[in-house]
Amino acid sequence: MSGILASNGSFMGAAPEISLSVAISLGPSGKSGQEEMVSQAIRWCRISQDADIISLSLGANPGMGMDDESETTLAVQEALDDGIFVIAAAGNTGLNADITDVSIPANIEGVISVAATNKNGNIWKNSAFGSETDSFTGEERVFPNQKPEISAPGVRLYSTYSSASDSALYAYSSGTSDSTVLVTGALALILEKYGEDIAGTDGKIDYSEINLVKVALANSANSDDQDYIHHSQRGYGQLDATAWAEQIRIEFGIE
């Protein structure tokens, strides 16, 4: 995922000049992990790395015991309360009728949950559906926090590959983990340009400003004639980074 975000060689990442910290929160296979490791990684990004954005290309299926008092949920909420943007994969469970919401922690209100589209801009069949109801509060989700919020390319994305594990230098992968990184890259570039304006006179981004950035995201999405109606699998539409930046300029009254 780091190559999709920050590669600056033959393949250029979404934000090649980004200052990147990488936290290992999954096991050796990269496919499973423990909640304690995930929550510690999130807190490390917040406390030790002073992160502006925490990008989570991971998730657990809803109903796996993570409630509003779980360590992962608390760690994410601490980050949001501290003015850190959290972007998380919606999940790859679109073909599983038994799973009715995006992954944890993408299902947390302030998090930007990301779905995946294919090269034609159509929603990837495996991209998770979001529920109309917040699983923590039992209340109906409302704009701009309906799940998922946004979709981005996530099918067969080529990136750098660890030469330590294989002779290949590049490989491709598919999933909402990939699309999450593209949204992270877009936001990183936006914060580089408008971060001080978003933070305001106190120089500190707060939860209300995170929410307004999400309003701008929803209003900027390429919604293919959806007229900004939320779709349970596609979100408010497909990422348009340039339009998002322009909408942020409008929402925050930036000259």
Please give the residue ranges for each predicted region.
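Secretory-pathway/membrane protein signature
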Residues: 130-133, 145, 227-230, 241, ...
